[in-house]
UniProtKB/Swiss-Prot annotation:
This is Guanine nucleotide-binding protein subunit alpha-14. The keyword Zinc-finger does not apply. Belongs to the G-alpha family. G(q) subfamily. Keywords: GTP-binding, Magnesium, Metal-binding, Nucleotide-binding, Transducer.
Amino acid sequence: MAGCCLSAEEKESQRINAEIEKQLRRDKRDARRELKLLLLGTGESGKSTFIKQMRIIHGSGYTDEDRKGFTKLVYQNIFTSMQSMIRAMDTLRIQYTSEQNMENALVIREVEVDKVSSLERKHVEAIKKLWEDEGIQECYDRRREYQLSDSTKYYLSDIDRISNPGFIPTQQDVLRVRVPTTGIIEYPFDLENIIFRMVDVGGQRSERRKWIHCFENVTSIIFLVALSEYDQVLAECDNENRMEESKALFKTIITYPWFQNSSVILFLNKKDLLQEKIMYSHLIDYFPEFTGPKQDSQAARDFILKLYQDQNPDKEKVIYSHFTCATDTENIRFVFAAVKDTILQLNLREFNLV
């Protein structure tokens, strides 16, 4: 009855209040409809490549114009790789098989990589001759003894295509480009009316102090491990094994108080490189506790997975693991579909889906 006696102003005021209440409830519901996925792992484990795959699979992908924007970076990656090998030739005391390649090495050495925006014919010829040199090939085979990008062989084997005047990077070229992540990159994408906000933070040691800001309201941690790093040393510290560093970081992350309510998903990445490398670089030489057969990538994968699972002190906490190849779009499409289902299952109550 009292409602009949309300003035027009009071009715309007009530209507506005009801609208505000409704909007607040909507905002609260929308906040719940956003999932924050934190991508963690040491440098070069494949986090940025994974974000690129999300853009290809669940976002707008890369147009011709977008891919053109990577041309300069592809060229720079090629020079960086060749310069790394030229320096390593000196350090490892490997001889060039062709005298002329000593001169070619000088030509490439003088290039200021940051200023490269095109490929000159003299540089292309020098790079091709160097890459064909048996000394450089020996140096490439010994790459675990120095720092060299995983994409080196991919780009150098394709130098003819890349040096074409009308070159536009392919999707695979874009996925392979190496640019160290500095700062924090966020990539939100919409899946089934739920926003997945993926956050990629720099993996190098100097970048890790920036992570702290990302720790609030994390739904899931996706931790990437490069399987192929079992025999490599850190870029920042040349006598520390990369996998030992990654393992220690994983333990720190999963025992952080912030993450006790976050699910943990482990991507054992670069399975393709492990398969290649395990044929000549034996796991037991770096992890003496490995008792499996040599040249067996499945045994190596199982051992490395257990290494990481053993870092988990809380046996109640499930770690969801997947073997991945971040440069393979179909593999990531398949794996992320499983990850999405896991995350949604774990958050059903939040989304009122039960």
